[in-house]
Amino acid sequence: MAHSVKIYDTCIGCTQCVRACPTDVLEMISWDGCKANQIASAPRTEDCVGCKRCESACPTDFLSVRVYLGSETTRSMGLAY
């Protein structure tokens, strides 16, 4: 089952999510909108298994990468927005 992976503009280009993904769904692409001049991209969402390791690895408190499982959106597990 494919999942939708949303990348938000709080991405700092650290590559933690890319390295955490067991199915290589994510990759870094050039982007001038952040300090690192790169952002995570999800070109292979059909391979996403919904493990959410990318969310756990994200140092910006789940705000950069969110995995949507069907109609359910992920929750930030008690983090305030």
Swiss-Prot record:
The organism's place on the tree of life at top rank: Eukaryota
Cofactor note: Binds 2 [4Fe-4S] clusters. Cluster 2 is most probably the spectroscopically characterized electron acceptor FA and cluster 1 is most probably FB.
GO biological process: photosynthetic electron transport in photosystem I
Segments forming a coiled coil: none
Residues the entry annotates as binding [4Fe-4S] cluster 2: 21, 48, 51, 54
Segments crossing the lipid bilayer: none
Subcellular location: Plastid, Chloroplast thylakoid membrane
Catalytically driven reaction(s): reduced [plastocyanin] + hnu + oxidized [2Fe-2S]-[ferredoxin] = oxidized [plastocyanin] + reduced [2Fe-2S]-[ferredoxin]
Membrane topology annotation: Peripheral membrane protein
A GO molecular-function annotation: electron transfer activity
Predominant subcellular localization, coarse grouping: plastid
EC class name: oxidoreductase
Domain 4Fe-4S ferredoxin-type: 2-31, 39-68
Keywords associated with the record: 4Fe-4S, Chloroplast, Electron transport, Iron, Iron-sulfur, Membrane, Metal-binding, Oxidoreductase, Photosynthesis, Photosystem I, Plastid, Repeat, Thylakoid, Transport
Names of the cofactor(s): [4Fe-4S] cluster
Pfam families xref list: Fer4_21 (PF14697)
PROSITE patterns given in the database record: 4FE4S_FER_1, 4FE4S_FER_2
Residues that, per the record, bind [4Fe-4S] cluster 1: 11, 14, 17, 58
EC nos: 1.97.1.12
GO cellular component assignments: chloroplast thylakoid membrane; photosystem I
SUPFAM superfamilies: 4Fe-4S ferredoxins
Quaternary context: The eukaryotic PSI reaction center is composed of at least 11 subunits.
Role, per record: Apoprotein for the two 4Fe-4S centers FA and FB of photosystem I (PSI); essential for photochemical activity. FB is the terminal electron acceptor of PSI, donating electrons to ferredoxin. The C-terminus interacts with PsaA/B/D and helps assemble the protein into the PSI complex. Required for binding of PsaD and PsaE to PSI. PSI is a plastocyanin-ferredoxin oxidoreductase, converting photonic excitation into a charge separation, which transfers an electron from the donor P700 chlorophyll pair to the spectroscopically characterized acceptors A0, A1, FX, FA and FB in turn.
UniProt-recorded name of the protein: Photosystem I iron-sulfur center
Source organism (scientific name): Anthoceros angustus
Biological classification of the source: Eukaryota, Viridiplantae, Streptophyta, Embryophyta, Anthocerotophyta
